[in-house]
UniProtKB/Swiss-Prot annotation:
It comes from Salmonella typhimurium (strain LT2 / SGSC1412 / ATCC 700720). S-methyl-5'-thioadenosine binds at Q33, E108, D140, G141, P165. This is Polyamine aminopropyltransferase. Its main location: cytoplasm. Homodimer or homotetramer. The gene is speE.
C-alpha cells in the first residue's frame, strides 16, 4: 500500500470508515491473516487484520482496561489468568498491573503477530512480554482450552470478529473448553462486537454461553475506533453475585490494587452493565 492514501475498513458492506495512511510500517500476509500496521496523524499507529481495524494507539486503553479490570476486580483474588489472542500485548500489559496475579498465559495462533507488535506497537505491550509471570503459547485457542491441564480464575478472549481465524472463538466448542479449564467461581469475558450493528453476534454468544454458565450477560464501553461506537463484551460465570458487587467493594479493590487508569474507574465498572433496551428486548425474544 502506498503512503498518503486512504485505507478503507471492509467489515461492513454498506458503510464503514477510512483512515489516512501517513506511513506504512508493515504490511504482509502471514500464514493466517493479512496484517498491516500504519501511522495516522489522528490515531497514531493503527493495526488491521484482514481489512478490519483491531487497535490504535490513541484509544486502545479503553478496550484493554475494560477487558481486564472489570473481570479481575469483580473476581477479587484471581491468581491465574488466561488470555486468548491479544498478540499486540496490551491486554497482557493491563493484567500485569495486578500484582496478586501469579501466572499469565497467552495463547496466540500466529507467532508473527507477536513479533510484529513487539517491534511496531511498543506502547501497547510496554515491556509486558518480559514479565516473569508470563507464558506465551502458540496454538489455536479452541485446541488449547480443550487440551490443557491448567486451570484459570479469569479467561479473557481478545478475539477478532467471527470471520477467518477468529470464527472458532465464537463456537460452542470454544465456550465449552473455557468452562472446562475455568476454576469454580471464575469469570470468562470476550469481545463481542458493536451490538447496534452486530446484534446477531451478541445473541448467538449469549445463547451458546448459557449452555455452560449460569450467569451470562454483557457489559459495554465506548471505543471510537470500532465503527458504531459502543463495544459489547460477553460476561459468563457461575457466580451471579460477581456482576452485582457494591461500588464500595469495587472501590476498595481498585484502591488496594493501586491502579491508575485513563478510562476505567469503579463508577464506570458498575455503569458498564447497564444495557440499552433494544438489547434487553432482543435477549428476551430469543
Amino acid at each position: 500500500m502506498a503512503e498518503n492514501t486512504m485505507w478503507h475498513e471492509t467489515l461492513h458492506d454498506q458503510f464503514g470508515q477510512y483512515f489516512a495512511v501517513d506511513n506504512v510500517l508493515y504490511h504482509e500476509k502471514t500464514d493466517h491473516q493479512d496484517l498491516i500496521i500504519f501511522e495516522n496523524a489522528a490515531f497514531g499507529r493503527v493495526m488491521a487484520l484482514d481489512g478490519v481495524v483491531q487497535t490504535t494507539e490513541r484509544d486502545e486503553f479503553i478496550y484493554h482496561e475494560m477487558m481486564t479490570h472489570v473481570p479481575l476486580l469483580a473476581h477479587g483474588h484471581a491468581k491465574h489468568v488466561l488470555i486468548i489472542g491479544g498478540g499486540d500485548g496490551a491486554m497482557l500489559r493491563e493484567v500485569t498491573r495486578h500484582k496478586n496475579v501469579e501466572t499469565i498465559t497467552m495463547v496466540e495462533i500466529d507467532a508473527g503477530v507477536v513479533s510484529f507488535c513487539r517491534q511496531y506497537l511498543p506502547n501497547h505491550n510496554a515491556g509486558s512480554y518480559d514479565d516473569p509471570r508470563f507464558t506465551l503459547v502458540i496454538d489455536d485457542g479452541v485446541n488449547f482450552v480443550n487440551q490443557t491441564h491448567q486451570t484459570f480464575d479469569v479467561i479473557i478472549s481478545d478475539c477478532t470478529d467471527p470471520i477467518g481465524p477468529g470464527e472458532s472463538l465464537f463456537t460452542s466448542a470454544f465456550y465449552e473448553g473455557c468452562k472446562r479449564c475455568l476454576n469454580p467461581g471464575g469469570i470468562f469475558v470476550a469481545q463481542n462486537g458493536v451490538c447496534f450493528l452486530q446484534q446477531d453476534e451478541a445473541l448467538d454468544s449469549h445463547r451458546k454461553l448459557s449452555h455452560y454458565f449460569s450467569d451470562v450477560g454483557f457489559y459495554q464501553a465506548a471505543i471510537p475506533t470500532y465503527y458504531g461506537g459502543i463495544m459489547t463484551f460477553a460476561w459468563a460465570t457461575d457466580n451471579d453475585a460477581l456482576r452485582h458487587l457494591s461500588s464500595e467493594i469495587i472501590q476498595a479493590r481498585f484502591h488496594a490494587a493501586g491502579l491508575k487508569c485513563r478510562y476505567y474507574n469503579p463508577a464506570i465498572h458498575a455503569a458498564a452493565f447497564a444495557l440499552p433496551q433494544y438489547l434487553h428486548d432482543a435477549l428476551s425474544a430469543q
